[in-house]
């Protein structure tokens, strides 16, 4: 898990191990959350170095080496914020509503935007699409950068017949935010 950690309710009992690069939803860059069943920890190969065994950290209360104090502090602040928002169910509802707004635009664009995921398989966290032509995509990326939209236009999936470029967009703080948003 990464983009979707704490974005929706997940029954952790369904997994032996959850490894979440959680810097998008839970804390600063580099934060990793690991949730492991004790039965899974016991399956580590003996020849693994100590630092590569999850059991090393579990058996030492995650304090085998110096903990990243600031990252832990920020995760704690984020968890409190999520609780204040109404918990994970409220966060999931909010995420679904925001994603629906974007998917509705894609679905009702008469082919201007082309979504990739089947409706039942869509992510509320990573919305992928293309525009009708590669030229339109280049223009979209250029104009998006001016509006503080971070566009990963270089993501390419290899299909059996030909590569399929996928656009993924995320808002990021603008360097010139005052000038960009002064009319709002």
Model features per residue range: what roles?
Residues 112-116, 148-154:
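A short linear hydrophobic-aromatic micro-motif
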């Amino acid at each position: 898990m990464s983009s979707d950690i704490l974005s929706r309710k997940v029954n952790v009992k369904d997994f032996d191990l959850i490894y979440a690069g959680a810097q998008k939803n839970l804390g600063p860059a580099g934060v990793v959350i690991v949730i492991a069943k004790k039965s899974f920890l016991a399956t580590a190969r003996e020849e693994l170095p100590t630092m590569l065994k999850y059991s090393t950290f579990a058996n030492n209360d995650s304090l085998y080496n110096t903990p990243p104090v600031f990252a832990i502090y920020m995760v704690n602040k984020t968890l409190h914020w999520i609780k204040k928002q109404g918990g994970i169910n409220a966060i999931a509802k909010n995420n679904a509503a925001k994603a629906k707004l974007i998917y509705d635009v894609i679905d009702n664009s008469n082919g201007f935007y082309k979504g990739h995921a089947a409706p039942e398989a869509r992510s509320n966290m990573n919305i992928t699409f293309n525009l009708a032509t590669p030229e339109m995509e280049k223009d979209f990326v250029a104009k998006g950068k001016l509006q503080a939209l971070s566009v990963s236009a270089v993501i390419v999936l290899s299909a059996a017949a030909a590569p399929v470029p996928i656009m993924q967009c995320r808002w990021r703080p603008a360097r010139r935010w005052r000038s960009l948003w002064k009319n709002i």
